[in-house]
Amino acid sequence: METALAKTPQKRQVMFLAILLLLWEAGSEAVRYSIPEETESGYSVANLAKDLGLGVGELATRGARMHYKGNKELLQLDIKTGNLLLYEKLDREVMCGATEPCILHFQLLLENPVQFFQTDLQLTDINDHAPEFPEKEMLLKIPESTQPGTVFPLKIAQDFDIGSNTVQNYTISPNSHFHVATHNRGDGRKYPELVLDKALDREERPELSLTLTALDGGAPPRSGTTTIRIVVLDNNDNAPEFLQSFYEVQVPENSPLNSLVVVVSARDLDAGAYGSVAYALFQGDEVTQPFVIDEKTAEIRLKRALDFEATPYYNVEIVATDGGGLSGKCTVAIEVVDVNDNAPELTMSTLSSPTPENAPETVVAVFSVSDPDSGDNGRMICSIQNDLPFLLKPTLKNFYTLVTQRTLDRESQAEYNITITVTDMGTPRLKTEHNITVLVSDVNDNAPAFTQTSYTLFVRENNSPALHIGSVSATDRDSGTNAQVTYSLLPPQNPHLRLASLVSINADNGHLFALRSLDYEALQAFEFRVGATDRGSPALSSEALVRVLVLDANDNSPFVLYPLQNGSAPCTELVPRAAEPGYLVTKVVAVDGDSGQNAWLSYQLLKATEPGLFSMWAHNGEVRTARLLSERDAAKHRLVVLVKDNGEPPRSATATLHVLLVDGFSQPYLPLPEAAPAQAQADSLTVYLVVALASVSSLFLFSVLLFVAVRLCRRSRAAPVGRCSVPEGPFPGHLVDVSGTGTLSQSYHYEVCLTGDSGAGEFKFLKPIIPNLLPQGAGEEIGKTAAFRNSFGLN
């Protein structure tokens, strides 16, 4: 074991110190008090706080308490007054035995911060025990030929008191033959001897009975008695004599039972029965003596296990008696040799668990160690595991503190299992292990952490109020209230974003709710920040970005920009009967307020006066002729166009077109709405068209006047077709005829009717001057077009 320990020098070992090691604030001298033994419990020994210079309030705030080996509660500290009280009645003989002085060592422990004070309590002896002889009767056999002055040893009386309270004198009942002499032994005890004063005469008195009294020195004195019975024998000339009057021997405490301790020897010069010697223990106390002697061989053997820690030394008196009753005495001093038969003991005084994680050099535990063995067998070392953030520090004698070596981290390790190993230096080495569990208490050193730095949430527009749109989540590595997270909305960076009216957050679980119905067309996306705050002190927080994207719903129907469907006079498109198939009649223009596929528009010719005459392109809204026109086709046609989006479910709108088939363009006027009072500001579309068409207004007016003049001159050659229901003559002053401008191809003429009170413009395709499509019979069409242009005198 020694080799194994020597191979681990890296272990933090704290060597046991024989002298007092002082804590940083502890004094070097102990405070000593003295009280008589058997003092009643509750007795106030002293005001300890005053004697140590401590405030009374300091005792309570610093967790003061008394400590005695084995954590026995013998003294009690009143932390309110500072008085040191006797917890129970103390018996000096039980606490210390024959040891003098009897001093009990206490420690005053202050836990916050850790500080020790040594306190000694001396128990003074009182005369509470009377002397007591080991036997009620002692037998002496004395030959009648014994000369006066002969001394006969007597057994001593036991008195558990010490000092003057123990046996001080022996007396004997009055008689004419003997007196008692009192002598001091080497250990301080007094022993009696019976001295013959007058020769005995067996024929006169064969037996005597005397009373031996032992007196102690107490006040008042106590006494004990025994009877000495003396038998007078015939002549026996010689008493037994030991070869040595004093024997010294050492016996290991772990010696087996019945092992031989020593052999004594005595001789008697007489012959026969008077020379036969028998041996016995003089005191003969079977209770206290762990030895036995063979009466014939004088072998002293061990009859009960020895314990160095209980009794390290014995004085055994041996008496040798011959057949005639004469005796001799010797003393055997037996020293019990200590062996390492006791493992160290560890007594935990205080354990602070849990321990804050942010407090280095915090005292976690205070404990004491002891080993009743002596020498190296009682020297100890303490150690803990090498991989722990803790240190052992010696304080007072046999006391250690376990402190944190550095700042702990509860999130990394919430508890530590520490094994304190106490090993003595004996052979073989014995050790004791004590396991403690240290819990690490949480400190708010971790801010909440979101599972994502940013969140993207999707909400379909037209949602119901209080709709749960998503959640954010944050975790805190701390524990308890330090890990309880509260969520909140942070003020938006955009001052125009009314966040409080858009969303709310559940403070406990991070659920986000839309407070009102969202409109994609008004707000496509917005972002804000959420905060997560724990409930520690001080509180820590973090934040995350939340983006909310509003998904479009098909909540807007297509809106037809052209032709306008505002209840005013319908627009009429003029189509020459000579138009080829695929001739562009007009183009329906529509928009949809939605986005994506909800705004993908398709066009469909829903109704027609003559099905098959016109066709409509589904994707661009162009209305074209589907075949050649004939004289049999009606002049007026009404087309209903369906404009449908691609949403789910789809939404639609309809537009009505009027088409007029013409052979020429004599008076191609259409009924116009009544003029209205001028309006201060036109519609944005009207303004755009007016600005675009005003640049060519003069050319258009000139063309119209020229057209009217030609028609009047050649009425006979061209019949009037498609007459508009407006008075002939110049246009009213609030109407402007525009040609070759607009959002469609420049090859078209437009008639724009602007009303001063409507705030909107109406425009209509009349007919193309030069067709923008050349069908298969391109040459023939060009020829007809040239003739047509000649009819207007445009070449």
From Swiss-Prot:
N6-acetyllysine: residues carrying this PTM: K296
Gene Ontology biological-process annotations: calcium-dependent cell-cell adhesion via plasma membrane cell adhesion molecules; cell adhesion; chemical synaptic transmission; homophilic cell adhesion via plasma membrane adhesion molecules; synapse assembly
Signal sequence annotation: 1-30
Physiological role: Potential calcium-dependent cell-adhesion protein. May be involved in the establishment and maintenance of specific neuronal connections in the brain.
Cytoplasm keyword on record: no
MF terms (GO), sorted A to Z: calcium ion binding
Entries under Pfam families matching the protein: Cadherin, Cadherin_2, Cadherin_C_2
Annotated localization: Cell membrane
Parts of the chain on the Cytoplasmic side: 711-795
Cited InterPro entries: Cadherin-like_dom, Cadherin-like_sf, Cadherin_C, Cadherin_CS, Cadherin_N, Protocadherin/Cadherin-CA
Species this chain originates from: Homo sapiens (Human)
Protein name (record): Protocadherin beta-5
Membrane topology: Single-pass type I membrane protein
Spans through the membrane: 690-710
Glycosylation sites: N169, N417, N435, N566
SUPFAM superfamilies xref list: Cadherin-like
Main location: membrane
GO cellular component terms, A-Z: membrane; plasma membrane; synapse
